Amino acid sequence: MNILVVGSGGREHAVIKKLRENNEVKKIYALPGNGGIAADAECVNIGATDIDGIAEFAKNNQIDYAVVTPDDPLVLGCVDRLERLGIPCFGPRKNAAIIEGSKVFSKNLMKKYGIPTAQYEVFDSAEDALAYLDSAPIPTVIKADGLALGKGVIIAATRDEAKEAVVEIMRDKKFGKSGDSIVIEEFLTGPEVSVLSFTDGKTVVPMISSMDHKRALDNDEGLNTGGMGTVAPNPYYTKEIADRCMKEIFLPTINAMNAEGRTFKGCLYFGLMLTENGPKVIEYNCRFGDPETQVVLPLLKSDLLTVMRATTYGTLAETPVEFSDKNACCVVMASKGYPVAYEKGYEIDIPDEIRDSVYVAGAAEKNGKLVTSGGRVLGVTAVEDTLREAIASAYEKAEKIHFENAFYRHDIGAKALAATEEK
């Protein structure tokens, strides 16, 4: 089989490495891929949002199956386009990807179908939003309606911060059209949990839960990032909570999308907050999370391609999906200065003996060498029997990788470890 994978991050590298375990897979193309992915797939310089280019390439290269993982091409209708060419895909169509593409849509969906989430108001005028903030409870959360590279959510600790966020998003157009409307919502507290799931629009199979670390610096300080590391499973996510989420959140979401004529197939990501009043949805993503994928897929015992195809063809209920009972930890190594300004072009040295555990993101190939080209450069994952061992092993591997201006958090998994050892 010839497989096409759209995207260029560590998440795509994790997907590609897992797909390679299937003997039917003869060739994997990554569009555009990156310098590190080039060791595991043929990278083709067609951007993830160049839907015409992707379709043209797929048509001319006998692609048997396509995996579309980034949010932008999904929201732009990449899957619809490839399906029209007769190419089966993993990922939702455009009318279902809106669950991530529009915060206003997803909040209204939850309200309409009684899915637990934070209280909220929607505004399409800055004046109205600013007036509302004069008396709104603080802290509060401001969300741009559309996609904003994961940067469109601002937690405002003061009224002034909240108003500043509204002005930046709606008047200064910090995120362009994505900020034409905003959601202002209640600030929830409690442990956060990421749950990725496979779904064919009828059956939902949750993957192993994980805990992301969004802030750039230790002790959850610094700016928000795309994610600086993850551990799986998440110790706060007990069987009792998982059962409750299936009944109150996961299945109701799939059923709500069906009722709206927007059947969702692919990977649906649930960002959850475990509040005193039970689990609530903070966000939906219409695809694998990054770096959650880098801990969840290494724990998947079943064949990934088989499970993906089951979501496409509606046979997930008959397809066994098994996960290891081990623990995984991923530490993200970034360029100093991320997520603001950082230098690029530094050579990356990864010892051969740990290469299988490394998922490359912001790196390019230059004169036969791998060099830094992005903020989050790579993630290194360890799978061990216990969480403590997985964390220690991931850091041991990270210390063996070298590039100029590298930095990473030193407390990935510390909170999870404390929770595990409290039990």
Where are these regions (language model features)?
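Active-site "cap" helix and flanking loop/linker of ATP-utilizing ligase/carboxylase catalytic domains
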Residues: M246-L268, N285-E353
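Solvent-exposed alpha-helices and their adjacent loops that cap or buttress functional pockets
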Residues: E21, G36-A38, F90, K112-G114, ...
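ATP-binding N-terminal substructure of ATP-dependent carboxylate-amine bond-forming enzymes
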Residues: M1-K94
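Internal nucleotide-binding/catalytic subdomain
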Residues: G152, A156-T293
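Peripheral (often C-terminal) accessory segments that flank ATP-dependent C-N-forming ligase machineries
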Residues: A310-K423
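Glycine/small-residue-rich loop that forms an oxyanion/phosphate-binding "nest" at active or ligand-binding sites
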Residues: V67, C78-R93, I98-T117, E121
